[in-house]
Structure formats: structure tokens, C-alpha cells
């Protein structure tokens, strides 16, 4: 499997007629949408027969994934009008205990990013716009300014806001340890998972961590009755700057002017996150410093901790005299 933080992304490009769309690249906030055959609504997702969010499952716990469309999904009723995704988690098998460990280090990179002009290019373009809109007397920058920025004279170095804000790659660590086994009467599967996903920002202040564990136990009471217990726990930790929407950072970056340095002379990041940008015509844009927005030490902190526990117990009864007929019930 391709290492992913969100299991919903496993379906991308793998199943005919199934489309996925990741609405955000923010660690822990991918919010991937699944659509089957262009339906406008999400399909019904059943994990071991229980309706739940596909993204809440560790990919290492998945045994199989099936996608049902049209008539094949009709058995699940009105809820299956947009298709069905069936996910089965791993279970124990008879035999000696089997211990498995997997570890992945993934470097995520941006597929495309717009190039920004340099300080000297920006000054030349603003001066050209001024001369076209007004006249030479009202030009924001003089010819001397253009020369100074081109030669990077002290005080005219400018700054590369893209490089100061964003790194070329973001690492993601994944670890999973599982133990399975059993005998004729009792079978078990237990797993422990950990994910640490960093963001593209130099501040590394949009981190996401996840701890998860799962235990599936099957007990054979007699030749006709089987009892099972499925337990899972997951903890999601999201650490972000306070009240920062990702879209705001990109908007601020698009208006950040390269004539201004990204740090002060003592190499301290620009301390005031509320300073407005000034357009070439002299009006303020009202946007903030994108680097400050991405830094918890400047913009404050917003931490979110989610704990999710799920449990399912039930039994299956083989009806005597009718081959293959099984009755069952479960509580979750």
C-alpha cells in the first residue's frame, strides 16, 4: 500500500468509476471526498458491517476493500443509493503468534507552485504600471530605486517570501506493530499504529500526530455459536497557530511584496502579524504577514485533541439442518 495519513486516499486512481478529491493538504485535515460514478453525495461506508468514516481506519488494519455500485448495492437499502464501500479489517488465524512491524518515511512534495518575482523585478513592474497609469512625477519608485534593488545595495535586499514560508518537502513517519494468532477456539488480532505528519511550512507549526490501536477477538463457544469482540481506540493531535485558516496564509503570500525583508536585521521574524500590505497605488490591502500567521510563537496556539473509542460485540449462530444459513446479531 502507498503510505497515506488518510485511508480514504487509498482509493485514488485504483477503482474504476470511483473518484476521490482531497479538499486540503493540511496535515490531519485532508477531508477526502469519495464519489462513485459522479454521484453528488458520498457512498455508504461500512467497516466490518458498521457505518463509519473511512478515514478513521488505519490502512495497516485493512484486510480488503470492496466497492458496490448500482444493483449490487441495492441489498443495503435506501442508504446505498450512492453506492457502498465495504471495508473488512484483519482478524486472527489459527497458528503460532505472528508479529509484524512496518515503518515508512515519506517525503511529500508540492506538485506545483507559482513563481514570485524578485524585488528588482517587482520594482520595475510597479514603476512601469505607475508610468502607464499616472505620470513620472507620481511613480512609486525612482530609477535609482530600480538600480539599488537590482544591485542589492544594503537596505534594498528585499526578501523571498515563498522560500521563507515554505520548505520543498514535508516528512511523514508511519509505524505499525501487529500481533495475531490463536487456536481452534480463540483467535486474535491486535495492532498499534503511529503517524507523525509535518507541514510544508518552515515553522513546522501545522503538525499532526495520531496514535491508534485495534483488537479483534473471535471465540468459538461450540460447533454452532461463535462470539466476537472488536475494539478500537484512536487519538488525533493537531497543533496549529491560533485562528489561522490555511487559505488566509496563501492570500497573504500572494500579496507579500518582495521589496520587504522577511526578517529583521537581528534575524527575528517580523513581529507584527497585523501590518497591512501596501499596493503599488498606495492603498492598503489589509492582509497580514503570512510567516507570522504560520508561526505559533507569534500568532498564538490552537491545539486540538480528539479521542475516539469504538466497540462491537456479537455472536453468530449456525442454523442446524440448513447448510450455510447463519443468524447473527451485534451491538456497537
Residue ranges of model-derived segments:
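Short loop/turn motifs enriched for small/polar and acidic residues
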Residues: 37, 104, 232-236, 330-332
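A surface-exposed, glycine/aromatic-enriched loop/edge motif typical of exported proteins
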Residues: 109-143, 234-283, 332
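Outer-membrane beta-barrel proteins, especially TonB-dependent receptors
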Residues: 138, 143-145, 152, 209-212, ...
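Outer-membrane beta-barrel transmembrane strands
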Residues: 167-184, 193, 232, 287-332
